[in-house]
Swiss-Prot record:
Functional description taken from the UniProt entry: Part of the ESX-3 specialized secretion system, which is required for siderophore-mediated iron acquisition and for the secretion of EsxH and EsxG. EccA3 exhibits ATPase activity and may provide energy for the export of ESX-3 substrates.
Keywords assigned by UniProt, alphabetized: ATP-binding, Cytoplasm, Nucleotide-binding
Protein family: Belongs to the CbxX/CfxQ family.
Protein name listed in UniProt: ESX-3 secretion system protein EccA3
Superkingdom, taxonomy of origin: Bacteria
CDD domains found in the cross-reference section: AAA
GO MF, one annotated term: ATP hydrolysis activity
PANTHER family in the record: AAA-TYPE ATPASE FAMILY PROTEIN / ANKYRIN REPEAT FAMILY PROTEIN, AAA-TYPE ATPASE FAMILY PROTEIN _ ANKYRIN REPEAT FAMILY PROTEIN
Amino acid sequence: MGSDTLAAPPHGAPRVDRDVVSRFATCCRALGLTVNDRQRPADLTAARAGFAGLTHLAHDQCDAWIGLAAAGEVTPAVVDAVWRTVASAGVLQREIGLAAGELGFTYDTGWYLQFRATEPDDFQLAYAARLYEAGEFGEADGLVGEILARRPGWFDARWLQVAINHRAQRWSDVVRLLTPVVTLPSLDDVTSHAVRTALGISLARLGMFAPAMSYLEDPAGPIEVAAVDGALAKALTLRAQGEDDEATEVLQDLFATHPENTQVEQALLDTSFGLVTTTSARIEARSDPWDPETEPSEAEFVDPGAKDRKAHLLLEAEAELAEFIGLEEVKFQVARLKSSVAMAIRRQERGLAVAQRTNHLVFAGPPGTGKTTIARVVAKIYCGLGLLKKETVREVHRADLIGQHIGETEAKTNAIIDSALDGVLFLDEAYALVSTGAKNDFGLVAIDTLLARMENDRDRLVVIVAGYRKDLDAFLDTNEGLRSRFTRSIDFPSYTAPELVEIAVRMAEKRDSVFEKAAHDDMERLFTHLAQATTPDANGVERRSLDIAGNARFVRNLVERSEEEREYRLDHSDQEDFTDEEMMTITAGDVQRSAAPLLRGLGLSVPA
Protein backbone atom coordinates (compact mmCIF):
# COMPACT_ATOMS: atom_id res chain seq x y z
CA MET A 1 0.00 0.00 0.00
CA GLY A 2 1.19 3.54 -0.68
CA SER A 3 2.36 5.28 2.50
CA ASP A 4 0.86 8.65 1.57
CA THR A 5 -2.55 7.53 0.37
CA LEU A 6 -4.33 8.56 3.58
CA ALA A 7 -2.11 11.53 4.37
CA ALA A 8 -3.36 14.23 6.74
CA PRO A 9 -5.06 17.22 5.14
CA PRO A 10 -2.99 20.39 4.71
CA HIS A 11 -2.63 22.82 7.64
CA GLY A 12 -5.68 24.98 8.07
CA ALA A 13 -8.24 22.47 6.77
CA PRO A 14 -11.72 22.96 8.31
CA ARG A 15 -12.49 20.92 11.40
CA VAL A 16 -14.90 18.02 11.12
CA ASP A 17 -18.24 18.20 12.93
CA ARG A 18 -17.70 16.57 16.35
CA ASP A 19 -21.12 14.89 16.23
CA VAL A 20 -20.12 13.22 12.95
CA VAL A 21 -16.83 12.06 14.52
CA SER A 22 -18.66 10.69 17.57
CA ARG A 23 -21.18 8.81 15.46
CA PHE A 24 -18.37 7.45 13.27
CA ALA A 25 -16.54 6.16 16.36
CA THR A 26 -19.70 4.43 17.61
CA CYS A 27 -20.27 2.80 14.24
CA CYS A 28 -16.66 1.60 14.06
CA ARG A 29 -17.00 -0.02 17.49
CA ALA A 30 -20.09 -1.81 16.15
CA LEU A 31 -17.79 -3.26 13.48
CA GLY A 32 -15.64 -4.68 16.29
CA LEU A 33 -12.81 -2.18 15.77
CA THR A 34 -10.81 -0.76 18.67
CA VAL A 35 -11.52 2.95 19.12
CA ASN A 36 -9.79 4.95 21.88
CA ASP A 37 -8.68 1.66 23.48
CA ARG A 38 -12.29 0.48 23.66
CA GLN A 39 -13.59 -2.57 21.77
CA ARG A 40 -16.83 -4.51 21.84
CA PRO A 41 -18.14 -7.56 19.94
CA ALA A 42 -19.11 -6.81 16.38
CA ASP A 43 -22.78 -6.15 15.63
CA LEU A 44 -23.00 -5.79 11.87
CA THR A 45 -26.72 -5.03 11.89
CA ALA A 46 -26.16 -2.07 14.23
CA ALA A 47 -23.09 -1.01 12.25
CA ARG A 48 -25.01 -1.10 8.99
CA ALA A 49 -27.86 0.98 10.43
CA GLY A 50 -25.46 3.44 12.03
CA PHE A 51 -23.34 3.97 8.92
CA ALA A 52 -26.47 4.29 6.75
CA GLY A 53 -27.65 7.12 8.98
CA LEU A 54 -24.19 8.68 9.01
CA THR A 55 -24.02 8.78 5.20
CA HIS A 56 -27.19 10.89 5.22
CA LEU A 57 -25.68 13.25 7.76
CA ALA A 58 -22.18 13.37 6.21
CA HIS A 59 -22.70 12.26 2.63
CA ASP A 60 -19.42 13.87 1.54
CA GLN A 61 -17.31 11.84 3.99
CA CYS A 62 -15.73 8.86 2.23
CA ASP A 63 -15.05 7.05 5.53
CA ALA A 64 -18.77 6.90 6.27
CA TRP A 65 -19.35 5.12 2.96
CA ILE A 66 -16.34 2.84 3.54
CA GLY A 67 -17.85 1.91 6.89
CA LEU A 68 -21.21 1.14 5.30
CA ALA A 69 -19.47 -1.17 2.81
CA ALA A 70 -17.47 -2.75 5.65
CA ALA A 71 -20.78 -3.51 7.38
CA GLY A 72 -21.84 -5.55 4.34
CA GLU A 73 -23.45 -2.99 2.02
CA VAL A 74 -21.07 -3.44 -0.93
CA THR A 75 -23.70 -2.34 -3.44
CA PRO A 76 -23.04 -0.45 -6.69
CA ALA A 77 -24.48 2.72 -5.14
CA VAL A 78 -22.19 2.49 -2.10
CA VAL A 79 -19.09 1.74 -4.20
CA ASP A 80 -19.98 4.72 -6.42
CA ALA A 81 -20.23 6.92 -3.33
CA VAL A 82 -16.87 5.71 -1.98
CA TRP A 83 -15.24 6.68 -5.26
CA ARG A 84 -17.13 9.97 -5.56
CA THR A 85 -15.95 11.08 -2.11
CA VAL A 86 -12.48 9.47 -2.24
CA ALA A 87 -10.77 12.84 -1.71
CA SER A 88 -11.92 12.78 1.93
CA ALA A 89 -10.82 9.19 2.57
CA GLY A 90 -9.09 8.87 5.95
CA VAL A 91 -10.35 12.13 7.48
CA LEU A 92 -12.70 10.53 10.02
CA GLN A 93 -10.35 7.59 10.60
CA ARG A 94 -7.58 9.95 11.71
CA GLU A 95 -9.97 11.82 13.99
CA ILE A 96 -10.58 8.67 16.05
CA GLY A 97 -7.05 7.29 15.74
CA LEU A 98 -7.70 4.27 13.52
CA ALA A 99 -4.54 2.78 12.08
CA ALA A 100 -4.23 2.74 8.29
CA GLY A 101 -5.83 -0.39 6.86
CA GLU A 102 -8.11 -1.17 9.81
CA LEU A 103 -11.27 0.07 8.13
CA GLY A 104 -12.03 -1.45 4.76
CA PHE A 105 -14.34 -3.70 2.79
CA THR A 106 -14.06 -6.72 0.54
CA TYR A 107 -15.27 -6.51 -3.04
CA ASP A 108 -15.68 -9.13 -5.75
CA THR A 109 -13.46 -8.78 -8.82
CA GLY A 110 -15.97 -10.71 -10.92
CA TRP A 111 -13.66 -13.66 -11.61
CA TYR A 112 -12.72 -16.00 -8.77
CA LEU A 113 -10.92 -13.52 -6.48
CA GLN A 114 -12.06 -10.99 -3.90
CA PHE A 115 -9.85 -8.12 -2.72
CA ARG A 116 -9.85 -5.92 0.37
CA ALA A 117 -10.13 -2.17 -0.18
CA THR A 118 -8.66 0.20 2.43
CA GLU A 119 -7.03 3.02 0.44
CA PRO A 120 -7.78 5.20 -2.61
CA ASP A 121 -6.11 2.90 -5.18
CA ASP A 122 -8.16 0.00 -3.81
CA PHE A 123 -11.32 2.08 -4.09
CA GLN A 124 -10.44 2.94 -7.68
CA LEU A 125 -10.20 -0.79 -8.47
CA ALA A 126 -13.47 -1.53 -6.69
CA TYR A 127 -15.14 1.21 -8.73
CA ALA A 128 -13.60 -0.19 -11.94
CA ALA A 129 -15.02 -3.62 -11.05
CA ARG A 130 -18.44 -2.03 -10.58
CA LEU A 131 -18.16 -0.27 -13.94
CA TYR A 132 -17.26 -3.31 -16.00
CA GLU A 133 -19.99 -5.36 -14.32
CA ALA A 134 -22.35 -2.68 -15.67
CA GLY A 135 -20.84 -2.97 -19.15
CA GLU A 136 -18.68 0.17 -18.95
CA PHE A 137 -15.55 -1.68 -20.11
CA GLY A 138 -13.63 1.21 -21.62
CA GLU A 139 -13.90 3.46 -18.55
CA ALA A 140 -13.09 0.56 -16.22
CA ASP A 141 -10.03 -0.41 -18.25
CA GLY A 142 -8.85 3.20 -18.25
CA LEU A 143 -9.05 3.44 -14.45
CA VAL A 144 -7.09 0.22 -13.99
CA GLY A 145 -4.56 1.19 -16.64
CA GLU A 146 -3.92 4.50 -14.85
CA ILE A 147 -3.00 2.59 -11.67
CA LEU A 148 -0.79 0.10 -13.52
CA ALA A 149 1.10 2.98 -15.08
CA ARG A 150 2.03 4.07 -11.54
CA ARG A 151 2.26 0.63 -9.94
CA PRO A 152 3.11 -1.85 -12.71
CA GLY A 153 3.87 -4.69 -10.32
CA TRP A 154 0.64 -4.54 -8.31
CA PHE A 155 -1.15 -7.86 -8.73
CA ASP A 156 -4.59 -6.57 -7.68
CA ALA A 157 -4.66 -4.10 -10.57
CA ARG A 158 -3.36 -6.71 -13.02
CA TRP A 159 -6.09 -9.13 -11.96
CA LEU A 160 -8.79 -6.48 -12.39
CA GLN A 161 -7.57 -5.98 -15.94
CA VAL A 162 -7.67 -9.75 -16.42
CA ALA A 163 -11.27 -9.84 -15.14
CA ILE A 164 -12.31 -7.01 -17.48
CA ASN A 165 -10.78 -8.75 -20.51
CA HIS A 166 -12.31 -12.07 -19.48
CA ARG A 167 -15.79 -10.57 -19.34
CA ALA A 168 -15.22 -9.08 -22.80
CA GLN A 169 -13.85 -12.44 -24.04
CA ARG A 170 -10.53 -10.87 -24.99
CA TRP A 171 -8.70 -14.15 -24.39
CA SER A 172 -5.40 -13.12 -25.94
CA ASP A 173 -5.16 -10.18 -23.53
CA VAL A 174 -5.88 -12.47 -20.57
CA VAL A 175 -3.02 -14.72 -21.71
CA ARG A 176 -0.73 -11.71 -22.13
CA LEU A 177 -1.49 -10.47 -18.62
CA LEU A 178 -1.26 -13.80 -16.79
CA THR A 179 1.68 -15.51 -18.48
CA PRO A 180 4.30 -13.36 -16.67
CA VAL A 181 2.82 -14.07 -13.21
CA VAL A 182 1.56 -17.67 -13.33
CA THR A 183 4.82 -19.09 -11.96
CA LEU A 184 5.50 -16.41 -9.35
CA PRO A 185 6.40 -18.09 -6.03
CA SER A 186 4.78 -15.20 -4.15
CA LEU A 187 1.26 -16.29 -5.17
CA ASP A 188 -0.71 -17.94 -2.38
CA ASP A 189 -2.68 -21.14 -3.04
CA VAL A 190 -5.96 -19.35 -3.73
CA THR A 191 -4.45 -16.81 -6.11
CA SER A 192 -2.37 -19.45 -7.88
CA HIS A 193 -5.46 -21.59 -8.43
CA ALA A 194 -7.32 -18.64 -9.95
CA VAL A 195 -4.42 -17.69 -12.22
CA ARG A 196 -3.80 -21.24 -13.47
CA THR A 197 -7.47 -21.84 -14.19
CA ALA A 198 -7.97 -18.49 -15.92
CA LEU A 199 -4.88 -18.96 -18.08
CA GLY A 200 -5.84 -22.51 -19.04
CA ILE A 201 -9.38 -21.51 -20.01
CA SER A 202 -8.14 -18.55 -22.06
CA LEU A 203 -5.58 -20.64 -23.95
CA ALA A 204 -8.26 -23.23 -24.69
CA ARG A 205 -10.59 -20.53 -26.03
CA LEU A 206 -7.79 -19.51 -28.40
CA GLY A 207 -7.57 -23.11 -29.65
CA MET A 208 -4.16 -23.59 -28.02
CA PHE A 209 -5.10 -26.92 -26.52
CA ALA A 210 -1.70 -28.36 -25.64
CA PRO A 211 -0.52 -25.39 -23.53
CA ALA A 212 -4.02 -25.08 -22.06
CA MET A 213 -3.83 -28.66 -20.78
CA SER A 214 -0.61 -27.88 -18.91
CA TYR A 215 -2.69 -25.62 -16.63
CA LEU A 216 -5.95 -27.61 -16.70
CA GLU A 217 -4.52 -31.10 -16.13
CA ASP A 218 -5.24 -30.86 -12.40
CA PRO A 219 -8.13 -28.39 -12.01
CA ALA A 220 -8.66 -29.03 -8.29
CA GLY A 221 -7.95 -26.24 -5.82
CA PRO A 222 -9.32 -24.08 -3.01
CA ILE A 223 -11.74 -22.10 -5.23
CA GLU A 224 -14.73 -24.36 -5.88
CA VAL A 225 -16.11 -22.45 -8.86
CA ALA A 226 -12.65 -22.35 -10.46
CA ALA A 227 -12.26 -26.09 -9.91
CA VAL A 228 -15.56 -26.72 -11.71
CA ASP A 229 -14.75 -24.29 -14.54
CA GLY A 230 -11.29 -25.81 -14.91
CA ALA A 231 -12.60 -29.38 -15.01
CA LEU A 232 -15.23 -28.48 -17.61
CA ALA A 233 -12.63 -26.67 -19.73
CA LYS A 234 -10.33 -29.69 -19.39
CA ALA A 235 -13.07 -32.04 -20.59
CA LEU A 236 -13.94 -29.84 -23.58
CA THR A 237 -10.26 -29.43 -24.45
CA LEU A 238 -9.83 -33.21 -24.41
CA ARG A 239 -12.91 -33.49 -26.63
CA ALA A 240 -11.47 -30.93 -29.05
CA GLN A 241 -8.31 -33.04 -29.24
CA GLY A 242 -10.33 -36.14 -30.09
CA GLU A 243 -9.81 -37.77 -26.69
CA ASP A 244 -13.50 -38.50 -26.19
CA ASP A 245 -13.22 -41.29 -23.61
CA GLU A 246 -11.04 -39.18 -21.34
CA ALA A 247 -13.38 -36.19 -21.79
CA THR A 248 -16.42 -38.28 -20.87
CA GLU A 249 -14.68 -39.60 -17.77
CA VAL A 250 -13.94 -36.05 -16.56
CA LEU A 251 -17.52 -34.95 -17.28
CA GLN A 252 -19.00 -37.93 -15.45
CA ASP A 253 -16.88 -37.23 -12.37
CA LEU A 254 -17.89 -33.57 -12.54
CA PHE A 255 -21.59 -34.35 -12.90
CA ALA A 256 -21.44 -36.74 -9.95
CA THR A 257 -20.38 -33.89 -7.66
CA HIS A 258 -22.24 -31.04 -9.39
CA PRO A 259 -25.47 -32.44 -10.89
CA GLU A 260 -27.02 -28.96 -10.80
CA ASN A 261 -24.54 -27.63 -13.37
CA THR A 262 -26.49 -27.43 -16.64
CA GLN A 263 -23.39 -26.94 -18.80
CA VAL A 264 -21.84 -30.15 -17.48
CA GLU A 265 -25.10 -32.02 -18.10
CA GLN A 266 -25.38 -30.64 -21.63
CA ALA A 267 -21.76 -31.55 -22.40
CA LEU A 268 -22.44 -35.12 -21.27
CA LEU A 269 -25.61 -35.50 -23.31
CA ASP A 270 -24.40 -33.76 -26.47
CA THR A 271 -21.01 -34.81 -27.85
CA SER A 272 -21.05 -31.81 -30.22
CA PHE A 273 -21.02 -29.44 -27.21
CA GLY A 274 -17.57 -27.90 -27.24
CA LEU A 275 -15.38 -24.86 -26.87
CA VAL A 276 -16.03 -21.84 -29.07
CA THR A 277 -12.55 -20.83 -30.16
CA THR A 278 -11.24 -17.67 -31.77
CA THR A 279 -7.92 -16.01 -32.58
CA SER A 280 -6.18 -12.89 -31.36
CA ALA A 281 -6.42 -11.46 -34.89
CA ARG A 282 -10.20 -11.85 -34.95
CA ILE A 283 -10.48 -10.31 -31.49
CA GLU A 284 -8.48 -7.29 -32.68
CA ALA A 285 -10.73 -7.02 -35.73
CA ARG A 286 -13.83 -6.22 -33.62
CA SER A 287 -15.61 -2.99 -34.48
CA ASP A 288 -16.16 -2.53 -30.72
CA PRO A 289 -13.15 -3.92 -28.83
CA TRP A 290 -15.27 -4.78 -25.79
CA ASP A 291 -18.22 -6.40 -27.58
CA PRO A 292 -17.71 -10.03 -28.69
CA GLU A 293 -20.79 -9.72 -30.91
CA THR A 294 -18.86 -7.35 -33.20
CA GLU A 295 -16.10 -9.90 -33.76
CA PRO A 296 -16.00 -11.30 -37.32
CA SER A 297 -16.71 -14.99 -37.67
CA GLU A 298 -14.07 -17.30 -39.03
CA ALA A 299 -15.71 -17.15 -42.44
CA GLU A 300 -16.02 -13.33 -42.40
CA PHE A 301 -12.53 -12.58 -41.14
CA VAL A 302 -10.03 -11.20 -43.62
CA ASP A 303 -6.56 -11.45 -42.15
CA PRO A 304 -4.31 -8.66 -43.48
CA GLY A 305 -1.24 -10.87 -42.99
CA ALA A 306 -2.77 -13.93 -44.63
CA LYS A 307 -1.21 -13.33 -48.06
CA ASP A 308 2.31 -13.29 -46.65
CA ARG A 309 1.66 -16.35 -44.51
CA LYS A 310 0.25 -18.27 -47.45
CA ALA A 311 3.29 -17.43 -49.54
CA HIS A 312 5.51 -18.54 -46.67
CA LEU A 313 3.61 -21.84 -46.38
CA LEU A 314 4.17 -22.55 -50.08
CA LEU A 315 7.88 -21.84 -49.70
CA GLU A 316 8.02 -24.10 -46.64
CA ALA A 317 6.27 -26.90 -48.52
CA GLU A 318 8.64 -26.55 -51.46
CA ALA A 319 11.70 -26.62 -49.18
CA GLU A 320 10.47 -29.65 -47.24
CA LEU A 321 9.74 -31.50 -50.46
CA ALA A 322 13.21 -30.72 -51.81
CA GLU A 323 14.81 -32.13 -48.64
CA PHE A 324 13.43 -35.60 -49.31
CA ILE A 325 15.96 -38.17 -50.43
CA GLY A 326 14.67 -40.16 -53.39
CA LEU A 327 10.90 -40.18 -53.96
CA GLU A 328 11.38 -38.38 -57.29
CA GLU A 329 8.07 -39.63 -58.68
CA VAL A 330 6.30 -38.60 -55.47
CA LYS A 331 7.80 -35.11 -55.72
CA PHE A 332 6.66 -34.87 -59.32
CA GLN A 333 3.12 -35.96 -58.46
CA VAL A 334 2.92 -33.43 -55.61
CA ALA A 335 4.15 -30.68 -57.95
CA ARG A 336 1.44 -31.65 -60.48
CA LEU A 337 -1.15 -31.62 -57.70
CA LYS A 338 -0.07 -28.11 -56.68
CA SER A 339 -0.29 -26.87 -60.28
CA SER A 340 -3.72 -28.44 -60.75
CA VAL A 341 -5.17 -26.81 -57.65
CA ALA A 342 -3.47 -23.44 -58.28
CA MET A 343 -4.71 -23.17 -61.87
CA ALA A 344 -8.23 -24.28 -60.92
CA ILE A 345 -8.35 -21.46 -58.38
CA ARG A 346 -7.11 -18.95 -60.98
CA ARG A 347 -9.68 -20.11 -63.55
CA GLN A 348 -12.43 -19.79 -60.96
CA GLU A 349 -11.30 -16.26 -60.08
CA ARG A 350 -11.61 -15.28 -63.77
CA GLY A 351 -15.03 -16.82 -64.14
CA LEU A 352 -13.85 -19.70 -66.32
CA ALA A 353 -15.34 -23.15 -66.07
CA VAL A 354 -13.60 -25.42 -63.58
CA ALA A 355 -13.98 -29.18 -63.78
CA GLN A 356 -15.22 -30.75 -60.57
CA ARG A 357 -12.19 -32.49 -59.08
CA THR A 358 -11.84 -34.07 -55.71
CA ASN A 359 -8.96 -32.95 -53.53
CA HIS A 360 -8.96 -36.11 -51.42
CA LEU A 361 -5.92 -38.34 -51.92
CA VAL A 362 -4.75 -41.94 -51.75
CA PHE A 363 -1.17 -42.43 -50.54
CA ALA A 364 -0.18 -46.00 -51.41
CA GLY A 365 3.03 -47.51 -50.12
CA PRO A 366 4.73 -49.38 -47.31
CA PRO A 367 5.47 -47.89 -43.88
CA GLY A 368 8.33 -45.44 -43.46
CA THR A 369 8.27 -44.05 -46.99
CA GLY A 370 7.27 -40.51 -46.05
CA LYS A 371 3.48 -40.64 -46.45
CA THR A 372 2.73 -38.76 -43.22
CA THR A 373 5.38 -36.13 -43.93
CA ILE A 374 4.14 -35.63 -47.50
CA ALA A 375 0.61 -35.27 -46.08
CA ARG A 376 1.90 -32.31 -44.06
CA VAL A 377 3.49 -30.87 -47.20
CA VAL A 378 0.19 -31.23 -49.07
CA ALA A 379 -1.66 -29.54 -46.20
CA LYS A 380 0.71 -26.57 -46.43
CA ILE A 381 0.23 -26.40 -50.19
CA TYR A 382 -3.56 -26.53 -49.91
CA CYS A 383 -3.52 -23.88 -47.18
CA GLY A 384 -0.99 -21.72 -49.01
CA LEU A 385 -3.19 -21.79 -52.11
CA GLY A 386 -6.26 -20.90 -50.07
CA LEU A 387 -8.03 -24.23 -50.51
CA LEU A 388 -7.88 -24.84 -46.75
CA LYS A 389 -7.81 -22.40 -43.84
CA LYS A 390 -5.36 -24.43 -41.77
CA GLU A 391 -2.24 -26.43 -42.53
CA THR A 392 -3.05 -28.87 -39.73
CA VAL A 393 -2.99 -32.63 -40.24
CA ARG A 394 -5.11 -34.80 -37.94
CA GLU A 395 -3.61 -38.30 -38.07
CA VAL A 396 -5.97 -41.10 -37.03
CA HIS A 397 -6.21 -44.88 -37.01
CA ARG A 398 -9.06 -47.37 -36.66
CA ALA A 399 -9.06 -47.19 -32.85
CA ASP A 400 -9.69 -43.43 -32.97
CA LEU A 401 -12.93 -43.91 -34.92
CA ILE A 402 -14.43 -47.19 -33.75
CA GLY A 403 -16.58 -47.56 -30.65
CA GLN A 404 -17.78 -50.61 -28.79
CA HIS A 405 -21.50 -49.90 -28.76
CA ILE A 406 -24.20 -48.83 -31.21
CA GLY A 407 -24.01 -45.09 -31.81
CA GLU A 408 -20.54 -44.71 -30.32
CA THR A 409 -18.66 -45.10 -33.62
CA GLU A 410 -20.70 -42.40 -35.34
CA ALA A 411 -20.13 -40.02 -32.42
CA LYS A 412 -16.38 -40.71 -32.28
CA THR A 413 -15.97 -40.36 -36.05
CA ASN A 414 -17.92 -37.10 -36.13
CA ALA A 415 -15.85 -35.70 -33.26
CA ILE A 416 -12.60 -36.60 -35.05
CA ILE A 417 -13.82 -35.00 -38.27
CA ASP A 418 -14.90 -31.87 -36.37
CA SER A 419 -11.36 -31.56 -35.01
CA ALA A 420 -9.93 -31.88 -38.54
CA LEU A 421 -12.21 -29.36 -40.27
CA ASP A 422 -10.45 -26.73 -42.41
CA GLY A 423 -7.38 -28.98 -42.48
CA VAL A 424 -6.38 -32.50 -43.51
CA LEU A 425 -7.66 -35.74 -41.99
CA PHE A 426 -4.97 -38.40 -42.49
CA LEU A 427 -6.35 -41.94 -42.10
CA ASP A 428 -3.40 -44.31 -41.86
CA GLU A 429 -3.85 -48.03 -42.51
CA ALA A 430 -7.35 -47.23 -43.75
CA TYR A 431 -8.08 -50.86 -44.64
CA ALA A 432 -8.06 -51.71 -40.92
CA LEU A 433 -11.54 -50.16 -40.76
CA VAL A 434 -12.97 -53.17 -42.61
CA SER A 435 -10.26 -55.80 -42.27
CA THR A 436 -12.32 -58.05 -39.98
CA GLY A 437 -14.73 -58.88 -42.80
CA ALA A 438 -17.66 -59.05 -40.38
CA LYS A 439 -20.97 -57.63 -41.63
CA ASN A 440 -21.64 -55.98 -38.28
CA ASP A 441 -18.17 -54.42 -38.08
CA PHE A 442 -18.51 -50.86 -36.80
CA GLY A 443 -15.83 -49.88 -39.33
CA LEU A 444 -18.53 -49.75 -42.00
CA VAL A 445 -20.42 -47.25 -39.85
CA ALA A 446 -17.27 -45.12 -39.64
CA ILE A 447 -16.93 -45.21 -43.43
CA ASP A 448 -20.57 -44.20 -43.96
CA THR A 449 -20.14 -41.35 -41.47
CA LEU A 450 -16.91 -40.25 -43.16
CA LEU A 451 -18.53 -40.24 -46.61
CA ALA A 452 -21.46 -38.18 -45.37
CA ARG A 453 -19.16 -35.61 -43.82
CA MET A 454 -16.93 -35.50 -46.92
CA GLU A 455 -20.05 -34.48 -48.83
CA ASN A 456 -21.53 -32.10 -46.26
CA ASP A 457 -18.18 -30.45 -45.43
CA ARG A 458 -16.62 -30.73 -48.88
CA ASP A 459 -15.30 -27.16 -48.70
CA ARG A 460 -13.77 -27.64 -45.25
CA LEU A 461 -12.29 -31.12 -45.28
CA VAL A 462 -9.58 -32.95 -47.20
CA VAL A 463 -9.10 -36.65 -46.46
CA ILE A 464 -5.95 -38.62 -47.23
CA VAL A 465 -6.06 -42.41 -46.83
CA ALA A 466 -2.80 -44.33 -46.61
CA GLY A 467 -1.58 -47.91 -46.62
CA TYR A 468 -0.42 -50.69 -48.92
CA ARG A 469 -1.78 -50.48 -52.48
CA LYS A 470 -3.66 -53.81 -52.46
CA ASP A 471 -5.15 -53.09 -49.05
CA LEU A 472 -6.31 -49.65 -50.16
CA ASP A 473 -7.89 -51.08 -53.32
CA ALA A 474 -9.83 -53.51 -51.14
CA PHE A 475 -10.80 -50.62 -48.83
CA LEU A 476 -12.09 -48.51 -51.72
CA ASP A 477 -14.16 -51.46 -52.96
CA THR A 478 -16.08 -51.76 -49.67
CA ASN A 479 -18.31 -48.79 -50.50
CA GLU A 480 -19.23 -47.53 -53.95
CA GLY A 481 -18.97 -43.94 -52.75
CA LEU A 482 -15.28 -44.23 -51.87
CA ARG A 483 -13.89 -44.70 -55.39
CA SER A 484 -15.62 -41.59 -56.71
CA ARG A 485 -14.20 -39.45 -53.91
CA PHE A 486 -10.64 -40.78 -53.99
CA THR A 487 -9.67 -40.36 -57.63
CA ARG A 488 -6.16 -39.02 -57.07
CA SER A 489 -3.44 -41.39 -56.02
CA ILE A 490 0.27 -41.09 -55.27
CA ASP A 491 2.42 -44.22 -55.03
CA PHE A 492 5.28 -44.29 -52.53
CA PRO A 493 7.98 -46.82 -53.47
CA SER A 494 10.25 -48.48 -50.95
CA TYR A 495 13.65 -46.85 -50.60
CA THR A 496 16.74 -48.33 -52.21
CA ALA A 497 19.70 -49.36 -50.07
CA PRO A 498 21.87 -46.37 -51.17
CA GLU A 499 18.99 -43.97 -50.42
CA LEU A 500 18.61 -45.40 -46.92
CA VAL A 501 22.35 -44.99 -46.30
CA GLU A 502 22.06 -41.36 -47.42
CA ILE A 503 19.09 -40.89 -45.08
CA ALA A 504 21.12 -42.34 -42.20
CA VAL A 505 24.07 -40.06 -42.95
CA ARG A 506 21.85 -36.98 -43.09
CA MET A 507 20.06 -37.90 -39.85
CA ALA A 508 23.42 -38.40 -38.14
CA GLU A 509 24.76 -35.06 -39.40
CA LYS A 510 21.81 -33.24 -37.85
CA ARG A 511 22.72 -34.89 -34.52
CA ASP A 512 26.47 -34.10 -34.77
CA SER A 513 27.31 -37.71 -35.54
CA VAL A 514 29.23 -39.27 -38.42
CA PHE A 515 29.56 -42.85 -39.70
CA GLU A 516 32.99 -44.29 -40.45
CA LYS A 517 33.45 -45.79 -43.93
CA ALA A 518 33.11 -49.38 -42.68
CA ALA A 519 29.80 -48.47 -41.04
CA HIS A 520 28.58 -47.12 -44.41
CA ASP A 521 29.41 -50.40 -46.08
CA ASP A 522 27.77 -52.45 -43.31
CA MET A 523 24.57 -50.41 -43.51
CA GLU A 524 24.36 -50.78 -47.29
CA ARG A 525 24.79 -54.57 -46.97
CA LEU A 526 22.13 -54.66 -44.25
CA PHE A 527 19.63 -52.59 -46.24
CA THR A 528 20.27 -54.64 -49.39
CA HIS A 529 19.59 -57.84 -47.45
CA LEU A 530 16.32 -56.43 -46.06
CA ALA A 531 15.24 -55.23 -49.52
CA GLN A 532 15.81 -58.67 -51.05
CA ALA A 533 14.39 -60.82 -48.22
CA THR A 534 10.70 -61.39 -47.59
CA THR A 535 8.82 -62.10 -44.37
CA PRO A 536 5.12 -62.74 -43.65
CA ASP A 537 3.45 -59.78 -41.93
CA ALA A 538 0.95 -60.05 -39.05
CA ASN A 539 -1.77 -61.08 -41.54
CA GLY A 540 0.40 -63.72 -43.21
CA VAL A 541 1.03 -61.63 -46.34
CA GLU A 542 4.57 -61.89 -47.71
CA ARG A 543 6.23 -58.46 -47.57
CA ARG A 544 9.70 -57.19 -48.20
CA SER A 545 11.59 -57.36 -44.92
CA LEU A 546 12.56 -53.72 -45.42
CA ASP A 547 8.87 -52.73 -45.55
CA ILE A 548 8.13 -54.66 -42.36
CA ALA A 549 11.13 -52.96 -40.74
CA GLY A 550 9.65 -49.61 -41.75
CA ASN A 551 12.13 -48.20 -44.30
CA ALA A 552 13.21 -44.72 -43.09
CA ARG A 553 11.61 -45.39 -39.71
CA PHE A 554 14.00 -48.32 -39.23
CA VAL A 555 16.89 -46.08 -40.26
CA ARG A 556 15.99 -43.56 -37.56
CA ASN A 557 15.89 -46.31 -34.94
CA LEU A 558 19.22 -47.65 -36.19
CA VAL A 559 20.89 -44.23 -35.97
CA GLU A 560 19.58 -43.61 -32.44
CA ARG A 561 20.55 -47.11 -31.25
CA SER A 562 24.03 -46.80 -32.84
CA GLU A 563 24.59 -43.54 -30.98
CA GLU A 564 23.69 -45.29 -27.73
CA GLU A 565 26.20 -48.04 -28.57
CA ARG A 566 28.87 -45.40 -29.23
CA GLU A 567 28.16 -43.71 -25.90
CA TYR A 568 28.36 -47.02 -24.05
CA ARG A 569 31.59 -47.98 -25.84
CA LEU A 570 33.29 -44.70 -25.01
CA ASP A 571 32.04 -44.62 -21.42
CA HIS A 572 33.47 -48.11 -20.77
CA SER A 573 36.82 -47.51 -22.46
CA ASP A 574 40.08 -46.90 -20.61
CA GLN A 575 40.36 -43.37 -22.02
CA GLU A 576 39.63 -40.45 -19.74
CA ASP A 577 39.24 -37.86 -22.47
CA PHE A 578 38.09 -37.96 -26.09
CA THR A 579 38.46 -35.83 -29.18
CA ASP A 580 35.40 -34.36 -30.86
CA GLU A 581 35.90 -36.81 -33.71
CA GLU A 582 35.86 -39.79 -31.35
CA MET A 583 32.71 -38.52 -29.65
CA MET A 584 31.00 -38.06 -33.04
CA THR A 585 32.08 -41.21 -34.89
CA ILE A 586 29.77 -44.22 -35.16
CA THR A 587 31.75 -47.36 -35.97
CA ALA A 588 30.79 -50.49 -37.88
CA GLY A 589 30.73 -52.32 -34.56
CA ASP A 590 28.22 -49.79 -33.17
CA VAL A 591 25.96 -50.41 -36.17
CA GLN A 592 26.26 -54.20 -35.96
CA ARG A 593 25.49 -54.29 -32.25
CA SER A 594 22.46 -52.06 -32.86
CA ALA A 595 21.01 -53.82 -35.90
CA ALA A 596 20.75 -57.31 -34.40
CA PRO A 597 18.38 -56.48 -31.48
CA LEU A 598 16.30 -54.16 -33.66
CA LEU A 599 15.75 -56.89 -36.27
CA ARG A 600 15.00 -59.54 -33.66
CA GLY A 601 12.43 -57.22 -32.10
CA LEU A 602 10.70 -56.99 -35.49
CA GLY A 603 10.79 -60.76 -36.02
CA LEU A 604 13.25 -60.42 -38.90
CA SER A 605 16.31 -62.52 -39.61
CA VAL A 606 19.73 -61.14 -38.78
CA PRO A 607 22.11 -61.37 -41.76
CA ALA A 608 25.29 -63.34 -41.17
